[in-house]
């Protein structure tokens, strides 16, 4: 039996990781080529939220409309931590993630008691309830005025180093580290045996149950994992804008994340990142040019749903497959 050579091992490693390395390189240059750093930061953090939702919908077939609840709770938990508990950067991020994960456990437990449209409607009901609580409990959330006075902490390890994160660019690259690490973890999940079971549940839940898998448990787990990473995106976003508002628990955020996944191509992981780039960038440019810019976004979404169901990533893969075919003819 032939043993793998170092060169073949390296080739395999490169095939496995070149997409993530390319993704990291692209996001590393975004702040320098986009009009302003805030736009690059928004694209990156919504790309993380979209990738987390793609794990739920694209890989497990779990549809939900409570993405904004996880993202927004991450925003609020980080904001309240910095305002009332501590100025520790990692504590704010950790509590944002913990709050969203806790909510995901509750919603996931309830939503997985039903299937199909009933499960989706339960997530929508929870999302509306969270929004109503945030709106009415103005003493805690600031209501329609939001929470202001949030100060972005610096990155400090006592006795080792301190990095000033007040610069938008410095904070972008701080978030960039979390983004790449989180994306890598999500990708490894999709390639793991756990990820294979999720895909089996997506394709045929009854068959997965018949061979012994507890499909409800797997769907609950993917709810929690998705909630963790959406909460992480929300916590990082809060410390960038230094503001928390009920807009971030509004259904519009959930709708935007769904659009990002379907536009980019669900079940691809890289597609939703591409979708986030297109949706956030197009929203920013179109809103500056036309008051009715949402019509453009709606038209774009309809086009991809009707004529390009594989999304942008599907179109990209088709173009790549066409290149060798042309080479063979020559």
What are these regions (language model features)?
Residues 31-84, 109-123, 198-210, 265-269:
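Single transmembrane alpha-helix segments in multi-pass membrane proteins
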Residues 1-28, 146, 196, 203-205, ...:
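Cytosolic-side transmembrane-helix boundaries in multi-pass membrane proteins
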Residues 27, 46-47, 75-76, 97-101, ...:
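Residue-level recognition of pore/gate-forming positions within transmembrane alpha-helices
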Residues 59-109, 157, 161-165, 285:
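Membrane-embedded helix boundary and interhelical linker motif in transport proteins
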């Amino acid at each position: 039996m032939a043993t793998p050579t170092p060169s073949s091992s390296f080739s395999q490693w490169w095939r496995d990781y070149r997409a993530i390395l390319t993704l990291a390189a692209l996001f590393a240059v975004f702040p320098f080529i986009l009009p302003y750093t805030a736009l690059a930061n928004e694209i990156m953090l919504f790309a993380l939220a979209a990738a987390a939702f793609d794990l739920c919908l694209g890989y497990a077939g779990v549809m939900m409309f409570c993405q904004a609840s996880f993202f927004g709770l991450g925003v609020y938990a980080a904001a309240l931590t910095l305002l009332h508990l501590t100025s520790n950067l990692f504590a704010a991020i950790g509590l944002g993630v913990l709050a969203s994960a806790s909510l995901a456990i509750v919603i996931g437990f309830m939503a997985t008691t039903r299937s199909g449209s009933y499960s989706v409607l339960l997530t929508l009901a929870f999302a509306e309830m969270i929004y109503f609580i945030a709106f009415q409990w103005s003493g805690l959330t600031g209501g329609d005025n939001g929470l202001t006075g949030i100060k972005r902490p610096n990155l400090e390890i006592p006795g080792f180093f301190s990095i000033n994160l007040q610069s938008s660019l410095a904070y972008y690259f701080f978030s960039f580290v979390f983004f790449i690490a989180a994306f890598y973890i999500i990708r490894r999940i999709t390639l793991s045996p756990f990820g294979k079971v999720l895909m089996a549940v997506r394709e045929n839940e009854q068959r997965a149950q018949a061979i012994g898998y507890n499909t409800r448990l797997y769907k609950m787990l993917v709810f929690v994992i998705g909630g963790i990473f959406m909460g992480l995106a929300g916590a990082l976003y809060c410390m960038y804008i230094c503001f928390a508002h009920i807009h971030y628990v509004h259904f519009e955020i959930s709708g935007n994340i769904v659009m990002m996944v379907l536009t980019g191509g669900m079940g691809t992981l890289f597609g939703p990142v591409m979708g986030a780039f297109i949706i956030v960038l197009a929203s920013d440019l179109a809103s500056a040019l036309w008051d009715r810019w949402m019509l453009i976004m709606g038209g774009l979404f309809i086009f991809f749903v009707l004529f390009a169901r594989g999304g942008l990533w599907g179109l990209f893969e088709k173009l790549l497959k066409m290149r060798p075919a042309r080479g063979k003819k020559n």
